[in-house]
């Protein structure tokens, strides 16, 4: 009898102590899309962004990814025009962290290798000087037609500078506080039909 009790006690000890319970580990992430709806088919110039921007910090490069931001341009033709010019200029480009740190990121905008700046216009099309706009060339060909013409192209967006608190610049993005930055990147387009 003693052997049976001892055997049962040993089985209980082995089954109760040798097994560790693994805890489940879960992680969650949220994807957010900006959403608005607008239709304008009567304005002389309409520029529509085709998507939103999302920059992710990559630890391996200690920096943020760049993004291609596509846009659609529609113009109304002017049959009296002899030349057409389309330019762009950066208006806003600061993202601010959504906490109390005041940390900021500045977004750079590039069009076909040329920086789009706040201080001057970037020429995208200038038919009088032979700048026909690459992917926007349908506009250079249709600016003097009697109907509307559309074309699509894109900017390259990248994080070009940042601060830890709104004033202290960082040279190493790994020193930025953890969190999410939000804001608008706005580019103004100007079209000129010359008669």
UniProtKB/Swiss-Prot annotation:
One Pfam match: MatB
GO cellular component terms listed in the entry, alphabetical order: pilus
InterPro entries listed in its UniProt record: EcpA, Fimbrillin_EcpA_sf
Matching Gene3D superfamilies: Fimbrial protein EcpA
Induction trigger: Negatively regulated by H-NS. Positively regulated by IHF and EcpR. Induced by low temperature.
Signal peptide residues on this chain, from the entry's feature table: 1-22
Main location: other
Annotated protein name in UniProt: Common pilus major fimbrillin subunit EcpA
Gene: ecpA
